Amino acid sequence: MTRDPVATARTLSEALPYLQRYAGAVVVVKFGGNAMGDEAAMAEFARDIVLMRQVGVNPVVVHGGGPMINELLGKLGIKSEFVRGKRVTDKATVEVVEMVLSGLVNKRIVQAINDQGGRAVGISGKDDDLMVCVADDPELGFVGKPVEMNVQVLRDLYNAGIIPVVAPVATGMADNETFNVNGDTAAGAIAGALQADRLLLLTDVAGVKDASGQVLSQLTPSQVREMVATGTISGGMIPKTETALAALDAGVRAVVILDGRIPNACLIEIFTDEGAGTIIRSTEPRIKPRIR
């Protein structure tokens, strides 16, 4: 495919205000969904993350791994159970979860980023007590809710030019048991603790939709709560919007729910006027170049 050099130059020029705006910003990216099982999509995601780092953004990647967990549990003959969309995690299951998330999935993402010329280091919520949890719900077993965060290790990594890749498993507060943490929940807690400029939740849908099925480009927290109350937001989108509202309450500037299957979704959201998906925020955007 022949590229128009003039159009390429124009695109780069139009990105300048955003490059200035996001220089030094912390952007937490939750990577999950079908893109995780596609090598080409994984490579494209990694390339976007490396580019963000190269132009001065500090990306922190948090990942899920549900399909891979289900696959290994099936091979081991361990039945998967879910309550209100969350995995029931008994002792046998949590060992598999940790093996898949901290081992297989985490290292695949790290390798993909390194293959694109980045410097990535994989850790879990256990490392340096990044996340300490209590049980989220007795019905769910070893599913954790983060109650203490130590994100200095993440700052140390990105200040050294390294991209942290975090597996959402954590240590229990009371007895040092291992807990599985929902990937969106972990990403929101990390973003809040870092006071991140953006939290990007990559999914397999285009964003939050209204009652007619149209994707909404932006919402306020009060609008989100109203849509949940009326049932317009339902199913799997409810926990994602709950994560978004909790992150905003914790000090994150804005949360974006976007389709991770779209090529260059993260770059479109961060560096273009159009953005991608649905942005949820309480304040007006700051998208203009700095005035000297």
Curated annotation (Swiss-Prot):
Pathway: Amino-acid biosynthesis; L-arginine biosynthesis; N(2)-acetyl-L-ornithine from L-glutamate: step 2/4. Its EC number is 2.7.2.8. Gene3D superfamilies: Acetylglutamate kinase-like (3.40.1160.10). GO terms for biological process: arginine biosynthetic process via ornithine; L-arginine biosynthetic process. It catalyses: N-acetyl-L-glutamate + ATP = N-acetyl-L-glutamyl 5-phosphate + ADP. It is an enzyme of class 2 (transferase). CDD domains: AAK_NAGK-C. Substrate binds at residues 65-66, 87, 180. Keywords: Amino-acid biosynthesis, Arginine biosynthesis, ATP-binding, Cytoplasm, Kinase, Nucleotide-binding, Transferase. It is found in: Cytoplasm. Disulfide bonds: none annotated. One of its GO terms (cellular component) is cytoplasm. InterPro entries: AceGlu_kinase-like_sf, AcgluKinase_fam, ArgB, Asp/Glu/Uridylate_kinase, Glu/AcGlu_kinase, NAGK-C. The record marks 30, 240 as: Transition state stabilizer. Catalyzes the ATP-dependent phosphorylation of N-acetyl-L-glutamate. This is Acetylglutamate kinase. It comes from Cereibacter sphaeroides (strain ATCC 17025 / ATH 2.4.3).
